[in-house]
């Protein structure tokens, strides 16, 4: 019954859509009901009615199965038989077309010179009496289940360990399987003698005066501010190029001599050699040439041509070479070829 009513509703809806609408292009005035009367605003679009069966799939308004009839065939509807456009050609073959087809087979039959694997005839004396393809009988095999002799060595859980050595000392932590017997709360006896490290005070006054700040227990006794006791000069103290100055005795008396010449004056000492950066180099060849390039690996080749020592030599592209022509020869009476003049 429900299907019949649904069909009747569809027929009524189609009939209403096919009828021409009255007062569709006019604006109605006054009170109008919302349903089932038409809207007062004219419109040209056709109302699409979606059946209730299409609204069940996640609020989708699109039809699940699109059934639109048109003249275009769908995929798989073609029945095309591909035939060659050439029917009466001498070069037509199953493998394609070519200019001069060959009727011979491309690869001939391969005939092996050796016999096949099943073509051998084995002599009866070499053939085995036992067919190894069949399973072996149980008579020539060891029994699968047999009693194994018990070993005299006890199993890991068959020992009777002494309870006294494995007794738990306290209940603070769990007892391990291989527990150490060394007690964790070992306190050395006072009869052992010396104090423990860090429990005694070293008298530093016997070695050197103890400073006022804190020091470590095992302090190094090496002095940090020792003065050198060596008499020899240290590194950088002497000049190897310096000559030893020998005091010369003056042969002139201190008193004034009665002569007309003065005392000879000693030569002035040599000035010290200049160090790096103290030279003042003077360029007497003129101002330096400033190169255009300023790269890190600048070329050392000069950009200005230098005058050659032989000015009479021709430069490049000054030669005019001439291509030599063909030279004719004459055969003389002495059977020799002589160039013609």
From Swiss-Prot:
Positions bearing Phosphotyrosine: 78
GO biological process terms on file: positive regulation of apoptotic process; positive regulation of mitochondrial membrane permeability involved in apoptotic process
Key word Manganese present: no
Nucleus in keyword set: yes
One GO CC annotation: nucleus
Keywords: Apoptosis, Cytoplasm, Nucleus, Phosphoprotein, Repeat
Subcellular location: Cytoplasm; Nucleus
Residues annotated as transmembrane: none
Primary localization: cytoplasm
STPGR repeats mapped onto the chain: 73-81, 115-123, 154-160, 194-223, 232-255, 273-284, 313-323
Disruption phenotype: After exposure to alkylating agent, significantly suppresses the depolarization of the mitochondrial membrane and the activation of BAK and caspase-3, all of which are hallmarks for the induction of apoptosis.
Pfam family, one: SHIPPO-rpt
Known function: May positively contribute to the induction of apoptosis triggered by O(6)-methylguanine.
Protein name per its UniProtKB record: O(6)-methylguanine-induced apoptosis 2
């Amino acid at each position: 019954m429900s299907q019949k009513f649904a069909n009747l509703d569809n027929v009524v809806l189609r009939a209403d859509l096919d009828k021409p609408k009255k007062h569709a292009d006019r604006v109605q005035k006054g009170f109008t009901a919302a349903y089932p009367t038409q809207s007062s605003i004219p419109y040209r679009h056709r109302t699409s009615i979606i059946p209730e069966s299409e609204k069940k799939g996640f609020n989708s308004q699109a039809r699940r199965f699109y059934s639109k009839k048109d003249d275009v065939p769908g995929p798989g509807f073609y029945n095309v038989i591909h035939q060659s456009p050439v029917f009466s050609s001498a070069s037509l073959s199953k493998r394609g077309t070519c200019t001069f087809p060959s009727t011979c087979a491309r690869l001939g039959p391969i005939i092996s010179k050796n016999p096949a694997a099943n073509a051998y005839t084995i002599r009866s004396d070499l053939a085995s009496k036992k067919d190894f393809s069949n399973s072996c009988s149980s008579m020539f095999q060891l029994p699968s289940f047999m009693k194994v002799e018990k070993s005299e060595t006890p199993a890991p859980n068959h020992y009777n360990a002494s309870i006294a050595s494995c007794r738990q000392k306290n209940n603070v932590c769990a007892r391990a399987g291989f527990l150490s017997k060394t007690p964790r709360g070992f306190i050395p006896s006072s009869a052992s003698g010396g104090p423990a490290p860090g429990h005694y005070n070293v008298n530093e006054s016997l070695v050197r005066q103890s400073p006022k700040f804190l020091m470590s227990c095992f302090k190094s006794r090496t002095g940090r501010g020792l003065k050198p006791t060596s008499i020899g000069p240290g590194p950088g103290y002497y000049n190897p190029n310096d000559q030893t100055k020998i005091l010369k005795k003056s042969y002139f008396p201190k008193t004034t001599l009665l002569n007309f010449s003065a005392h000879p004056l000693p030569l002035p000492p040599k000035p010290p050699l200049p160090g790096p950066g103290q030279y003042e180099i003077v360029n007497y060849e003129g101002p330096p040439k400033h190169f255009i390039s300023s790269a890190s690996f600048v070329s050392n080749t000069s950009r200005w041509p230098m005058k050659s020592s032989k000015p009479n030599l021709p430069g490049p592209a000054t030669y005019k070479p001439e291509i030599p022509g063909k030279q004719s020869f004459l055969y003389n009476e002495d059977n020799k070829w002589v160039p013609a003049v």
